[in-house]
Curated annotation (Swiss-Prot):
InterPro entries: UPP_synth-like, UPP_synth-like_CS, UPP_synth-like_sf. The gene is uppS. Changing residue 32 to R: Great decrease in activity. Decrease in activity. It is an enzyme of class 2 (transferase). Changing residue 221 to A: Decrease in activity. This is Ditrans,polycis-undecaprenyl-diphosphate synthase ((2E,6E)-farnesyl-diphosphate specific). The lineage of its organism: Bacteria, Bacillati, Actinomycetota, Actinomycetes, Micrococcales. The keyword Transferase applies. GO terms for molecular function: ditrans,polycis-undecaprenyl-diphosphate synthase [(2E,6E)-farnesyl-diphosphate specific] activity; magnesium ion binding; manganese ion binding. Its EC number is 2.5.1.31. The active site is at residues 29, 77.
Length: 249
């Protein structure tokens, strides 16, 4: 065990470099409440949350995390006020316009999961360009869950399998967990070992509900804009001190 140092010293967080989770998923919660506490508009909370994404992406990359999946916008978030939704749809472009050169320099690959075709054209354009420009990178894969819902993902997978079964392309005997995984957005990714949710809420909110069957959950009270490198180190330390049994002893 030895300390992992960030650019600004991390206090008393020893994490084992040999046991860094390959895939960390984060429900970035609390932007609006953070802003309300500070008597600021909700969109200011989302802006500050974007700065946190940059910090955490840098640190996860430095630690050697292979996949970092961030719940950016759910299929349920369309019900929020129109001006807030419009701002959230603008954020991916703002983020990538300012951060993409650094992502390329750090060998980070950008990916998305979710029903991307239903996003506004300018949002799709920004993320598709980032994916194209980073597709050959081999470091951290930064995955944005955009217009993502776990139940809708599962239903979509079932529909695709049913169509293939109906057409005679597959038999019932071929349908297994492994086969089912191939129809999910995350088909080419390992399941998350660690799921983190900020803001004190303790639920999945329809995020990676199939993939997180055996993930370790860490719920912390900090709002997402306050989450930093030390916070992530603490979450990883908690994960490393748990025993993952996968239903065994």
């Amino acid at each position: 065990m030895f300390p992992i140092k960030k650019r600004k010293a991390i206090k008393n967080n020893n994490i084992n470099a040999a046991q860094i989770p390959k895939h960390i998923a984060i429900i970035m919660d609390g932007n609006g409440r953070w802003a309300k506490q500070k008597k600021m508009p909700r969109i200011k909370g989302h802006y500050e949350g974007m700065q946190t994404v940059k910090k955490i992406t840098r640190y996860a990359s430095d630690l050697g995390v292979k996949y970092l999946t961030l719940y950016a916008f759910s299929t349920e978030n369309w019900s929020r006020p129109k001006d807030e939704v419009n701002y959230l749809m603008k954020l991916p472009g703002d983020f990538l316009n300012t951060f993409l050169p650094e992502l390329i320099e750090k060998n980070v690959k950008v990916e998305t999961i979710g029903f991307i075709d239903d996003l506004p054209d300018h949002t799709k354009k920004a993320v598709l360009e980032a994916k194209e420009k980073t597709k050959h990178n081999t470091g951290l894969t930064l995955v944005f869950a955009l217009n993502y819902g776990g139940r809708k993902e599962i239903i979509s997978a079932v529909q695709l399998i049913a169509e293939r079964y109906k057409s005679g392309e597959i038999s019932l005997d071929e349908i297994s967990e492994t086969h089912f995984n191939e129809y999910l957005f995350t088909a080419n990714m390992p399941d998350p070992e660690l799921l983190i949710r900020t803001s004190g809420e303790e639920r999945l909110s329809n995020f990676l509900i199939w993939q997180c069957s055996y993930s370790e959950f860490v719920f912390i009270d900090e709002f997402w804009p306050d989450f930093n490198e030390e916070s992530l180190a603490q979450c990883i330390s908690i994960y490393q001190n748990r025993h993952r049994r996968f239903g065994g002893l």
